[in-house]
């Protein structure tokens, strides 16, 4: 049986979708072969900033920079990557996000991603349809797993069937 699940892409995975790096193959193959991707608005902004840093430091050309940022924005704008996050601008949400950040020594962007998976739009889905975090960040993957979130480190191996 095939289960529907949402795959949340963190900033590191988003960057690998649009910038040629030596370890981008697994995530790109997976992205082009399946559906139901999401990211928080903050992760998308973080990814755009990371692409800018690569351009600013001469690691990619101006042409590559604009192609990468255009690709990210169009994928979000067109719905290929759904923008989904809990409202960070409420006392309860901020407290929840800060708590996750402090517990796992994460920044707000990473902890917002975890809080969104735990409390957001798709949090109610049953065990076989539970959302998955797609990341190239080992520390974030470990934090997600300790919170009961399934995580796939997209630079270590191809996607398993449960992703």
What are these regions (language model features)?
Residues 1-43, 50-68, 149, 153-163:
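Short, well-structured N-terminal submotif of metal-dependent ribonuclease cores
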Residues 29, 116, 143:
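Hydrophobic/aromatic ligand-binding patch that stacks against planar heteroaromatic rings
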Residues 39-45, 108-112:
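Aromatic- and histidine-enriched alpha-helix N-cap/loop-to-helix transition segments
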Residues 46-50, 96-97:
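A general alpha-helix detector
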Residues 54-89:
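Helix-adjacent hinge/juxtasegments
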Residues 79-139:
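Active-site neighborhoods of divalent-metal-dependent phosphate/nucleic-acid chemistry enzymes
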Residues 141-147:
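Short loop/helix-cap segments at secondary-structure boundaries that form the rim of catalytic
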């Amino acid at each position: 049986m095939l289960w529907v699940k949402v795959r949340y892409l963190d900033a590191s995975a988003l960057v690998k979708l649009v910038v040629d790096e030596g370890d981008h193959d697994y995530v790109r193959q997976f992205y082009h072969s399946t559906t139901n991707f999401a990211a928080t608005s903050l992760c998308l902004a973080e990814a755009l900033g990371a692409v800018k840093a690569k351009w600013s430091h001469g690691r990619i050309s101006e042409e590559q920079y604009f192609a990468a940022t255009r690709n990210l924005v169009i994928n979000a704008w067109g719905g290929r990557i759904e923008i989904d996050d809990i409202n960070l601008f409420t006392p309860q949400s901020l407290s929840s996000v800060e708590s996750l950040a402090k517990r796992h020594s994460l920044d707000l962007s990473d902890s917002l991603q975890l809080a969104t998976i735990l409390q957001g739009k798709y949090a109610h889905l049953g065990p076989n349809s539970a959302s998955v975090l797609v990341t190239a960040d080992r520390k974030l993957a470990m934090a997600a797993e300790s919170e009961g979130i399934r995580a796939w480190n997209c630079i270590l191996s191809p996607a398993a069937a449960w992703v």
